[in-house]
Amino acid sequence: MELKFNLKGAFKTSTDPTGAKEVIAQYFDEANNTILKKGAPEGQGAKITQWDIVDGSIELTIESGRYVRAHDAIMRLKKPLAAKLGKEFRIGIRGVDVKKFTISMPAEGEIGNMNIPHVSNISKVEGGLILELNVGESELERRIPDRILTLMEEKVRAKDYGGKAEHWQILWESDKKEHTFAGDPTQEMMKHGWIKRGASRGQWIHGPQSTKMFRTFEKIVYDELLEPLGYREMIFPKLVPWEVWQKSGHAKGVYPEIYYVCPPKTRDPAYWEEVSDHYKVTHEVPTELIKSKIGDPIGGLCYAQCPPFWMYLQGETIPTDEFPIKVFDKSGTSHRYESGGIHGIERVDEFHRVEIVWLGTKEQVIETARKLHERYMHIFNEILDLEWRKAWVTPWFMAQEGLTGLSEQGEAGTTDYEAPLPYRGDDGEWLEFQNVSINGNKYPSGFNVKSQTGEELWSGCSGVGLERWASAFFAQKGLDPENWPEEFRKRVGEVPKGIRFL
C-alpha cells in the first residue's frame, strides 16, 4: 500500500458563492496544474478530484500522496481563492471546515490497540492501515496530521525492527575469568549490614561500608578519567519541568518511568488545615484529600541526568576556542519507576550516578568518546579486574534514521558495557553497568546552542551508575577484601566498621 491522503472539506464563505462558480472552477483547474504540484516530483502532486457549492459553501475533495499532502493543499488554496473572490465578488472566506479526512499508510501485521489524539478510528486493511482523523482548521495549521503520521510511522518501524528496543552488536570481550564469589551481592551486603531497604520502593540506605565503596568508585572515576581528561564539575537540577523534556525529546515517551512532581495549589495553612486535622485524629495520611489540593504535574524528578544541564547553554552562542566543553555532575540521585516486584541494588528506583557530558564539533565529540572508552577499559581491566564486554547498541528510534550497523559505529549511538553475574549461572543475563552515548546534534539543536563559526554541534553523555558498578564488582569478587584486586584494595584502604544492632 502506498501512502495516500483523502480530505473532504469546505471553504466557509460570507455569502452564497454560486455567482462565482465559473471563476472557482477555473481557479481549481489552474491549481491542479500549478500550486498543488509545486515541490513534488512529476505526477506526485495533490489533486482536487471533485467540488461543488453546497449550502452556501465551497465543498471539495482533495487526494494526494506523500509530497503535497491534502491538508497542505487545502491551506495553499485558501489565500489565493479568498483574494480572487474578495476582489471580484466581495465574498470572504471565513474558514475551512474538515468534513472527512483519512490517511492510508503501509503497515504489515498487527499494530495493537492505540488511542491517538485526533484519530477517531484505525482500520486494518490488506497491506496497511486507514486512519480516520478528527481535525479542524486549527489542527491543519498546527500540522497535527503530519505529527500523527510521523508517530504512526515510528510505531510501524519500531515493530518492523524486530520487536526489540535495541540493536545489539558485540565489539570487544575480555578473557573469561575465574570468579571467587557466586552469591547474590545484594543479599550478601544485607547479611553483613552494608545496606538496608529504604521506606520507598527501589530505595536503599547505604551503611558506612557500602558508602565507602561508592566513594571509592567515584574517586577512581575522578582520578583516572575526569581529571586527566579535563572535565569540570557542575551541579545539575534534579527537578525537571516539562519544558526541558520537550526540548530533549524525552517528552515523547518518558511517562511510564518518571516520578511526577505536583506542587500544592497554595501554601496557605488554612487551605491545608483539614489535611492536618485528619491525620491528627486518624493517624492516617488522607491521600485522596491531598490529591484534590495539589496542582497538575509540573514535571518529574531527575530521570536522565543530563537534560537539565542544557538549560545552562540554551540560546547561547559559544566561542570556538571553548570547545570541546566537558563537564560532570555527581550532586544527587536520579529516579526511575521500575516495573515488577522487588529487585536488588542492580535495579533500583533511586540511584546514584556520575553524569558525564561533552559538547563540540562532530569530530571533537567522537574523539572525546574514544578517550572515554580508553579510560573505562583501563579502569575495568587494571583496577577492578572485571570480566566484561562492550557492545554497540542502537535504539530503534536511531535505527529508523539509518544509524545501525558497523559502518555507523563511530557516530551517533550508544556503547554498553556488560558484565556477567556469576550467581545467575553460565547462561544468565549479563548486567549493563556502564555506557557511552554519542547523541549527534539532538541536544544542541533542541536547546538552540550555536557555535561562533556556525558549525554544527554534537554532544555525548556517559552515566556512571554506582549501584551498577557495585553489582558487577561484588557479584564477581564478593565482599571479602582478600579477594579484591590489589589495585582496588589499595584505593579503598580500610573498610569502615558498620553500625551494630542488638
Curated annotation (Swiss-Prot):
Zn(2+) binds at C306, E355, C461. One of its GO terms (cellular component) is cytoplasm. Its cofactor is Zn(2+). Its EC number is 6.1.1.11. GO terms for molecular function: ATP binding; serine-tRNA ligase activity; zinc ion binding. It is an enzyme of class 6 (ligase). Binds 1 Zn(2+) ion per subunit. This ion is coordinated with 2 cysteines, 1 glutamate and a water molecule that dissociates from the zinc ion to allow the coordination of the amino group of the serine substrate, which is essential for catalysis. Its main location: cytoplasm. It is found in: Cytoplasm. Keywords: Aminoacyl-tRNA synthetase, ATP-binding, Cytoplasm, Ligase, Metal-binding, Nucleotide-binding, Protein biosynthesis, Zinc. Homodimer. Consists of two distinct domains, a catalytic core and a N-terminal extension that is presumably involved in tRNA binding. Catalyzes the attachment of serine to tRNA(Ser). Is also able to aminoacylate tRNA(Sec) with serine, to form the misacylated tRNA L-seryl-tRNA(Sec), which will be further converted into selenocysteinyl-tRNA(Sec). Belongs to the class-II aminoacyl-tRNA synthetase family. Type-2 seryl-tRNA synthetase subfamily. This is Type-2 serine--tRNA ligase. It comes from Methanococcoides burtonii (strain DSM 6242 / NBRC 107633 / OCM 468 / ACE-M).
